[in-house]
Amino acid sequence: MSRSPRKTPKSPSLQLGQAVEWPATPDAARLDRVPNPQAGTDYLVRFTAPEFTSLCPVTGQPDFAHLVIDYAPGAWLVESKSLKLYLASFRNHGGFHEDCTVSIGKRIAAEIKPKWLRIGGYWYPRGGIPIDVFWQTGKLPKGMWVPDQGVAPYRGRG
């Protein structure tokens, strides 16, 4: 017997299900959160953004990264459409690789207060040097399984 899908009513406070303009800047972007229906269970959520872009704050040239965001949720989850819009807001933002990566991790952590969060920013080379940036909050919950982020050391990533 098939089960009918749960219907969640549209919420005017969420961007999900709404026509939304792309935010002009990361500060203007809104990150939405939704209640975690499995709040009593330790588990891992992974977001992968293999085509993240920002701008060099000095030259204005585009910078490209493969971001991997892992977190152990508490009471809240990041709503994925709002995360997509937030990450896209960096497209015209001038920021060094380190600042972009750490700012994203801190912003998500501040919004949802996870039990644990880490971000890996694997930046493609500019001037022949790839830059990888890693940041995390606190300690991983005991017994939590966290797979490798799966981004190979630079040899022409892809």
Curated annotation (Swiss-Prot):
Q: Which InterPro entries match?
A: GTP-CH-I_C/QueF, NADPH_dep_7-cyano-7-deazaG_red, QueF, QueF_type1
- Kindly identify the residues recorded as the active site: C56, D63
What Enzyme Commission number does this protein have? 1.7.1.13
* Principal subcellular localisation of the protein: cytoplasm
In its keyword annotation, does this UniProt entry include Ion transport?
no
> Reaction(s) catalyzed by this protein?
7-aminomethyl-7-carbaguanine + 2 NADP(+) = 7-cyano-7-deazaguanine + 2 NADPH + 3 H(+)
Pathway assigned in UniProt = tRNA modification; tRNA-queuosine biosynthesis
One GO CC annotation: cytoplasm
Question: Per the similarity annotation, which family is this?
Answer: Belongs to the GTP cyclohydrolase I family. QueF type 1 subfamily.
Name of this protein: NADPH-dependent 7-cyano-7-deazaguanine reductase
Q: Which gene encodes it?
A: queF
